[in-house]
């Protein structure tokens, strides 16, 4: 993965953002396995207000949180993301998975971030499926990319539909 290059520079702050089951934890776990990051450097978005004063450099953000909290596919309504985007320097990895594959993953998933918490916290499949089915993914990705460009934040889009995490451009999404 050429995305390892950004992670190798320990000064970089990194946001990995994508819908539930898009592969955020898979990417981060690969970095840990390669020795490019450790678990203490990772902050799940919901923890941000609690641990922001600590040296955290990799942020795990569920893109569906915006829809879940605000019933909107407009990322500009997401106050927590707005706070995280003020971190400098920040590089963003946007994970894109086609909706059919995403729904398949969500329907089969049993646990919530097991590789990070080492406990079998049940994954709320039905709730996630409902959110996923109601969300306008194209609008969500579009508003995220427009926001990043407006704020002049560097980003890469990775197609996580298959395990190779291929780099793509936004025209493959919308």
Please annotate each region the language model reported.
Residues 74-84:
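Short secondary-structure capping micro-motifs at structural edges
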Residues 1-13:
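Extreme N-terminal, non-catalytic leader segments
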Residues 25:
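Walker A/P-loop
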Residues 2-5, 135-174:
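NTP-dependent small-molecule kinase module
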Residues 20:
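The conserved Walker
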Residues 28-73:
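Conserved substrate/cofactor phosphate-moiety recognition/catalytic segment
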Residues 16:
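Hydrophobic anchor at the beta1->P-loop junction of P-loop NTPases
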Residues 85-144:
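A glycine- and Lys/Arg-enriched "phosphate-lid" helix/loop adjacent to the NTP-binding pocket
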């Amino acid at each position: 993965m050429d995305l390892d290059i950004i992670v190798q520079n320990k000064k970089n702050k990194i946001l990995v953002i994508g819908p539930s089951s898009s592969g955020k934890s898979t990417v981060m776990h690969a970095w840990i396995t390669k020795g490019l990051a450790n678990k203490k450097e990772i902050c799940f978005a919901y923890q941000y207000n609690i641990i922001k004063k600590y040296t955290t450099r990799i942020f795990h953000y569920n893109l569906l949180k915006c829809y879940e909290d605000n019933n909107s596919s407009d990322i500009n309504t997401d106050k927590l993301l707005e706070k995280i985007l003020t971190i400098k320097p920040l590089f963003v990895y946007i994970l894109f998975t086609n909706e059919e594959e995403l729904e398949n993953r969500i329907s089969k998933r049993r646990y919530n971030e097991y590789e990070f918490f080492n406990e079998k916290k049940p994954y709320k499949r039905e709730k996630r499926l409902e959110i996923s089915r109601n969300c306008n993914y194209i609008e969500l990705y579009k508003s995220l990319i427009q926001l990043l460009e407006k704020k002049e934040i560097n980003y890469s889009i990775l197609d996580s539909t298959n395990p190779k995490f291929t780099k793509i451009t936004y025209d493959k999404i919308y």
